[in-house]
């Protein structure tokens, strides 16, 4: 592990986490049963990981620190499986089973779809 790699991951993670926090502040109050900030972070992150993987696949000559900054750091800090899991469990424990299932479908289905779309975007327009 290089010092620059360590720095790239740390800076990227801080920026991603700050964006996730901003999305939570802006969007979670809209509907507490389905916190849109967490959903937005995971869907945007899903799309951007597809774009990033496609981009780095076609730009293999870039220094590895860029991939660490964007994918491991920024997108790792932006997306959040633990918050998503906690929100789903809270819905289920509150008896809101339908909301819990919709939460799962929106996060997983939406993120997978947008990851494919992001990858397709880079492949199509490169």
UniProtKB/Swiss-Prot annotation:
Main location: membrane
InterPro entries for this protein: FluC (IPR003691)
Swiss-Prot/TrEMBL keywords: Cell inner membrane, Cell membrane, Ion channel, Ion transport, Membrane, Metal-binding, Sodium, Transmembrane, Transmembrane helix, Transport
Family: Belongs to the fluoride channel Fluc/FEX (TC 1.A.43) family.
Matches recorded under NCBIfam families: crcB, PRK14196.1
Function recorded in the entry: Fluoride-specific ion channel. Important for reducing fluoride concentration in the cell, thus reducing its toxicity.
Any single Gene Ontology cellular-component annotation: plasma membrane
Activity regulation annotation text: Na(+) is not transported, but it plays an essential structural role and its presence is essential for fluoride channel function.
Membrane topology term: Multi-pass membrane protein
HAMAP family in UniProt: FluC (MF_00454)
Transmembrane segments: 6-26, 36-56, 69-89, 99-119
GO biological process: cellular detoxification of fluoride
Reactions this protein catalyses: fluoride(in) = fluoride(out)
Name of the gene encoding the protein in the UniProt record: fluC
Chain residues that bind Na(+): 76, 79
The protein's name in its UniProt record: Fluoride-specific ion channel FluC
Subcellular location: Cell inner membrane
GO MF annotation list: fluoride channel activity; metal ion binding
Native source organism of the sequence: Ralstonia pickettii (strain 12J)
The organism's place on the tree of life at top rank: Bacteria
Alphabetized PANTHER family for the sequence: FLUORIDE EXPORT PROTEIN 1-RELATED
